[in-house]
Design a protein with these regions (language model features):
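Catalytic domains of riboflavin
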Residues: 1-154
Length: 154
């Protein structure tokens, strides 16, 4: 929803807001694997923690991520986009794919902290520690080690 809000703001300011959705649910491993990973994260020793976020996916699926971001900029090229003034994605992989394809990104826009649910903190902390864009400092190793996710029977 935040990305759509950014698009609306750009259009209201006389620019263009563009939403491009690439279906890659659960790091392109699919919905079933995504839910198996969620279940494994809650059941692991020590609970759901950011420090083991990517490891759980690898234990369940054999890989951490199956997305191939290098193809993602093709849609922008087809539409004639050469510059993005406000990029509403925190993904370092998507940003890297865009810039490697010659598309300039002027400003990166993070999801505002107040829009991140408490039970999504594990995912966001793991991703920012792994290189996702954040205007703040990424979490420390000590912060990543804390159990922060929902309990199995909560």
């Amino acid at each position: 929803a935040h990305g759509i809000e950014v698009c609306v703001e750009m259009a209201q300011q006389g620019g263009v807001g563009l939403v491009i959705y690439n279906r890659k649910e659960g790091r392109a491993l699919g919905e079933v694997t995504k839910f198996l990973v969620y279940n494994a994260r809650k059941r692991q020793y020590g609970g759901d923690r950011a420090e083991t976020y990517f490891e759980r996916t690898e234990c369940v699926a054999g890989v951490q991520d199956m997305r191939f971001q290098e193809l993602m900029p093709d849609v922008f090229h087809w539409l004639g986009v050469t510059r993005i003034d406000r990029w509403a994605s925190m993904s370092n992989m998507k940003h890297g794919a865009l810039t490697a394809a010659g598309i300039a990104v002027v400003e990166r826009v993070a999801i505002p902290d107040e829009l991140i649910p408490a039970d999504a903190r594990v995912e966001m902390d793991a991703k920012t520690a792994a290189g996702y864009f954040t205007p703040m400092a990424p979490p420390s190793a000590a912060e990543l080690a804390l159990a922060k996710g929902r309990e199995l029977h909560a």
